[in-house]
């Protein structure tokens, strides 16, 4: 009995170690993401595409890894990391304000948070939205920013409604349940470009963000460091610039942090 128990315990330990070291030793990195165009989304054939998909494929490829993107419930992202179902998060994920919560590689891109309103509304400035209703993605930095109001550019809202996805937040705006949606600028650009008769961007910055790749806190430090080296090389050799420009980004601002 003792021998059987010892063997079972050893098997459990080996499985746990394998899960924790999967990213370091395996050939495929499992990346958690949500649908957040133009960063991570699916094309007409159901394949993951986007800035982050191209970035991750190239960066991890230089390290000898293939990548597999997996759509997750974004507000439950921590549980996916803790369980080992995914190796990291790479989906327009903000480092700013979360520096001590994960093991990071990055920043690989810079972004701004902006407001989107209905195309038929009269709003032209952020100040006009004070006392109104806002929609954000749950567990996002936009949610925290609107509720805490630590940035003077952020107006005080009457109500902040949180949704599981940006698409749901945009639908709430379309149905006039809220007065604005706050999200990353190029995600807003994508929605406005796709549905210009429905949405319009307020051309002011609420606050700036740094975007990074998040591994579980205290895990995969060596891999994160190697990934950072690959990202730095992509900046130097022009690959990063080619990727962001492919999706219509301003390379100087997105890669250099300019506003």
Question: Which residues does each predicted region cover?
Answer:
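Periplasmic-binding protein-like
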Residues: 34-35, 110-117, 185, 189-229, ...
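Extended ligand-binding regions for polar small-molecule ligands
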Residues: 53-62, 123, 127-128, 132-133, ...
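A conserved helix-loop-strand patch within extracytoplasmic ligand-binding domains
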Residues: 65, 106-158, 218-220
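Beta->alpha turn/N-cap motifs
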Residues: 32-37, 70-75, 84-96, 119, ...
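Extracytoplasmic small-molecule ligand-binding "clamshell" domains
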Residues: 24-93, 162, 226, 246
